[in-house]
Amino acid sequence: MPNTVPEALADLPYFVACLGIALFLFTLGLAAYVAVAARRDMRLIAEGNVAAAAGMTGAFIGFALPLASAVIRSEALLGMLVWGGVALLAQLLVLAGLRLMLSSLVRSMRDGQVASGVFLGAVAVSVGILNAACLTY
């Protein structure tokens, strides 16, 4: 147990590095997802499409879950970077595939059907939970 403030803050550089890497990977994953699967959805969100916002919110949470798992399980920054990248790539591939398989739901979400957006968001979160659970290295 640390007895002084400097002792308590000894791990601050590791925290800052860890947070920086996690935010970088999160931003990279979301940018790739938007570029590959959801570019049009961002415009729809800007226009007030609640269904698209619900779907994108699920995707954001779905990306954060496996990344958080990689952060928690990593013993070093390099491991976090590698496994965080693996987790985000897996999430991106699965979500892109699901959007192709569920293309009619994607279309109805883009048409403003909130139920479709909520469902697609829930699928993204569910995939993120499974992805996070599989990071048991």
Language model region names:
Residues 14-38:
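N-terminal signal-anchor/start-transfer transmembrane helix
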Residues 130-137:
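Juxtamembrane boundary at the C-terminal end of a transmembrane helix
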Residues 51-71:
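A generic, lipid-embedded transmembrane alpha helix
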Residues 68-96:
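Short alpha-helical packing/oligomerization segments
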Residues 12, 16-20, 80-85, 118-119:
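Hydrophobic alpha-helical transmembrane segments
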Residues 104-124:
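Interfacial loop-to-transmembrane junctions
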Residues 30-44, 94-108:
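C-terminal ends of transmembrane helices
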Residues 1-12:
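Short, strongly hydrophobic alpha-helical membrane anchors
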